[in-house]
């Protein structure tokens, strides 16, 4: 896979800057299923959890037995270069990757990419609990307030910055704002100079925009966004 990735980069005449970029980690829910895969006359069952060898050994030690279970998620690693080169180079069938599993796979990915001339300068993922725990493991001994870590395989190169996926962050902010209000059970309210901002303010501003304002500002918003 990494040979294919390198050949794609060469075929596109990628500039040296294009070999630097970030890792995008995303885990998606899938429907549990078992299927046959035929390759070279050999049949193989696919659909089971298939993670790293370290993960398999850890599960055996924790459960005192070897378990075989259907995968419920697919974990994908994608390289995004600074010049726009995108390449999903590996994926795993999981039942929901833990923080420790993500930690092991992340550094393996960084190492393999470096072996083929690609340098990781940032890590991007959504705000799932396992991802936040993984981030805490990475930052545990750095004391960094900038969310950066050293590349353990090449400390002389640029640090690796950890960022949360923008779309997921904005969605989380939106969901929290939608739950804000003046009721006693509304505990999450945005504040600006000690003034609280409620969901009602956003809704009323939109209603004024579509009913009174002769030149509506938020033309892409609809009632479904608020009700």
Residue ranges and their predicted role:
Residues 66, 89-227:
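Non-catalytic regulatory appendages
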Residues 1-77:
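Structured nucleic-acid-interacting core domains from mobile-element enzymes and related host factors
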Residues 27, 31, 82, 112-113:
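Mid-sequence acidic-hydrophobic segments that form the walls
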Residues 18-21, 41-42, 73-75, 85-88, ...:
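Generic structural motif recognizing short loop/turn segments at the entrances and edges of beta-strands
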Residues 48, 81-82, 141:
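Marks the mature luminal ectodomains of secretory-pathway proteins
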Residues 80, 85-92:
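Fold-level signal for large, globular catalytic cores of enzyme and receptor domains
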Residues 22-29, 79, 123-128, 168:
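Short, conserved catalytic/metal-binding motifs centered on acidic residues
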């Amino acid at each position: 896979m990494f040979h294919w990735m390198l050949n794609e980069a060469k075929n596109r005449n990628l500039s040296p800057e294009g070999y630097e970029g970030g890792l995008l980690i995303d885990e998606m829910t899938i429907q549990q299923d078992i299927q046959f895969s035929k390759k070279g006359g050999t049949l193989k069952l696919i659909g089971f959890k298939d993670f790293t060898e370290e993960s398999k050994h850890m599960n055996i030690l924790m459960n005192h037995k070897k378990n075989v279970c259907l995968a419920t998620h697919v974990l994908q690693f994608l390289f995004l270069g600074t010049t726009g080169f995108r390449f999903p180079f590996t994926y795993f069938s999981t039942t929901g990757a833990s923080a420790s599993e993500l930690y092991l796979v992340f550094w393996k990915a960084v190492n393999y990419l470096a072996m083929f001339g690609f340098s990781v300068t940032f890590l991007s993922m959504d705000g799932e609990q396992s991802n936040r725990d993984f981030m805490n493991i990475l930052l545990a001994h750095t004391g960094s307030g900038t969310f950066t870590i050293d590349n353990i395989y090449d400390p002389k190169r640029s640090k690796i910055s950890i960022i949360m996926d923008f779309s997921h962050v904005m969605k989380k902010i939106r969901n929290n704002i939608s739950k804000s209000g003046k009721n006693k059970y509304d505990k999450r309210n945005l504040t600006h100079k000690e003034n609280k901002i409620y969901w009602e303010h956003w809704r009323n501003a939109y209603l004024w925009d579509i009913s009174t304002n002769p030149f509506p500002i938020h033309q892409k918003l609809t009632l479904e966004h608020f009700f």
